[in-house]
Amino acid sequence: MLRVAVVGGGPSGSCAAEVLAKAGIETWLFERKLDNAKPCGGAIPLCMVAEFDLPESIIDRKVRNMRMISPSNREVDIHLDNQDEYIGMCRREVLDAFLRNRAADLGAHLVNGLVTKIDTGTARQGPYTLHYTDYSSGEATGEPRTLEVDLIVGADGANSRVARAMDAGDYNVAIAFQERIKLPPEEMAYYEDLAEMYVGTDVSPDFYAWVFPKFDHVAVGTGTMQKNQSLIKGLQQGIRERAAKRLLKGEVIKVEAHPIPEHPRPRRVVGRMALVGDAAGYVTKSSGEGIYFAAKSGRMCAEQIVASSAGGSRIPTEADLKVYIKKWDKLYGPTYKVLEILQNIFYSNDAAREAFVEMCDDKDVQRLTFDSYLYKRVVTMNPWQQLKLTCLTLGAVLRGQALAPSGYRPVPSAVRSAAEVEAMEAVGAAIKGGIRTPQTARPSVPVPETSSVTIVTGTQEEEREPALAGK
């Protein structure tokens, strides 16, 4: 009987393990942190709820309103009028645990362990031996163990050890930084079904910042390319300031950071080793979405293993596994390319960002955006809509090029009046805890002992992502 090791217990690894175990294949699922709380916007599209049979209990909020805020703080509201449609907001620790446990219930061996080394054999064609530290006993040091397997699915995130073992090649990464800020009930009511996206060089020179609602707190974060990593805390302070009028009574309960892949790796299958999720580089440009594509890639890879192994009775070849890559690229390659083009156009400077937010005020653009995200499908348009969208896009490009030198500066938001904010600050209202910023950049914010700070860099941390469709 075929034996498969799935390294990494996030959405991609768990969904792969579920398919394999359900087919009766001996499946070992490795995850170092079973309480994984990866920094991630936590947005999932509506189609994922049905496609992956997710219960409503894991969805904290059903977002039907998205507010886009431009560099000058112009606000554009995008609404989902159909009450059956929504963007699901979840906590990664809840979603990941559900998917892992479902795979285990179907027969996958769930190992609380960290894979430290992989022997790949001659020319990486096997046999494959995993060296790992087993933490099942609860001891801090763990117990060293080995396991020989026929195939390996690498679902261990951007810092993938499996990718290194198979010489998959490097890729550029972005850095996602996020604070979880707990708000009193009267403030959380504002975010009942609302998420916010902010654009501007003050919050990210090449991405966007977000305020996404969770169960009893909001995730407030930003992302930028690795070359700008030294700026990340200043950018986080930028989104704090832009969104401050709704966060003044908040308290930071966790600070998180994580790398995000910017494009697929050069090699995603070598021998009988295959990469999925963040390890493979399946995060979309422009939106940073990763959860759905992680889960989908894990499932597609596992389905190919089941099919090519005749249900586990034979060992698939490298050529067999590469069929999964061909199917993936055919299905989603155009989506990744289009979103990369859009990022290059609309995130190039603040003038282009301003034009982009204005575009989002158009109802046809809103419907196109939401349908594409919610259902992961290409939305057809009539000739008039196509012409209008083309003109709007060209206008944004021209405006971005013409106005870029002038430079935009944020203006006060209209969420609360200046008088209201002054009154709140007079009685000591302020965000408590969180990041520390250099004295030369922005005012520092002390980190209280009660705040939990998590900088995630481990090899078995899974998919990421700030996500909307907008990880």
Residue ranges and their predicted role:
Residues 5-7, 21-40:
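Glycine-rich FAD pyrophosphate-binding loop
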Residues 35, 52-67, 112, 169-173, ...:
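A short alpha-helix-loop-beta-strand transition element characteristic
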Residues 46-100:
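A conserved beta-strand/loop capping segment in the N-terminal third of enzymes
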Residues 29, 154, 276:
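Generic enzyme active-site microenvironment
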Residues 117, 226-305, 309-310, 316:
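FAD/FMN-dependent oxidoreductases across multiple families
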Residues 13:
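N-terminal Rossmann-fold NAD(P) dinucleotide-binding loop
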Residues 307-471:
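C-terminal helical "tail/cap" subdomain of flavin- and related membrane-associated enzymes
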Residues 9, 102-248:
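Predominantly flavin-linked oxidoreductase catalytic cores and closely associated redox partners
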